[in-house]
Amino acid sequence: MTRILGIDPGSQRTGVGVIDVDEYGCSRHVYHAPLVLLGQSSFAGRLKQLLLGLSAVIEEYSPKEVAIEKVFMSKNADSALKLGQARGVAISAVVLRDLPVHEYAARQIKLAVVGRGGADKQQIQHMVGVMLNLQGRLQSDAADALAVAITHAHVSATAQRLGVSTKQAWSRK
């Protein structure tokens, strides 16, 4: 059984999701939540809150691997920089515990979970709920984090069957 932590980074809210994947590639939901970072008066305070929150999740759930969504380019440079900083803090929380980090673009995640790279938030929320047998509507940041973890589970299973790295399993040569 492999435990995977998925992270959907954000400067105001970061989604986290934990799944277990058995030797047959079947995923089971363990935990999900948004880490809400708006209670701090400064951006540095939010980054600290993110580091502490992710550290607590890693400590409690002991993932063996971590998957994180790659940053996308925003029209707003300030937003893109803040997102990049939040992502850097998230990666730091992971590598400080010597865990492997796997990165996936939003389009890759949508393709892996919904089957269409242009899927919208509601489609992702629905498919994550179906795949993990969850009842009710998922909060979007947490659903995105679970989608990242599911994507990594699928890519890892494919890579293992092919005897290649996860990067090679995803590339289209």
Curated annotation (Swiss-Prot):
Top EC class, one word: hydrolase
Record-listed Mg(2+) 1 binding positions: D8, D141
Catalytic activity: Endonucleolytic cleavage at a junction such as a reciprocal single-stranded crossover between two homologous DNA duplexes (Holliday junction)
Pfam families per the UniProt record, alphabetical: RuvC
Location in or out of the cell: Cytoplasm
Record: residues binding Mg(2+) 2: E69
InterPro entries: RNaseH-like_sf, RNaseH_sf, X-over_junc_endoDNase_Mg_BS, X-over_junc_endoDNase_RuvC
Official protein name in the record: Crossover junction endodeoxyribonuclease RuvC
Organism annotation: Xylella fastidiosa (strain 9a5c)
Encoding gene per record: ruvC
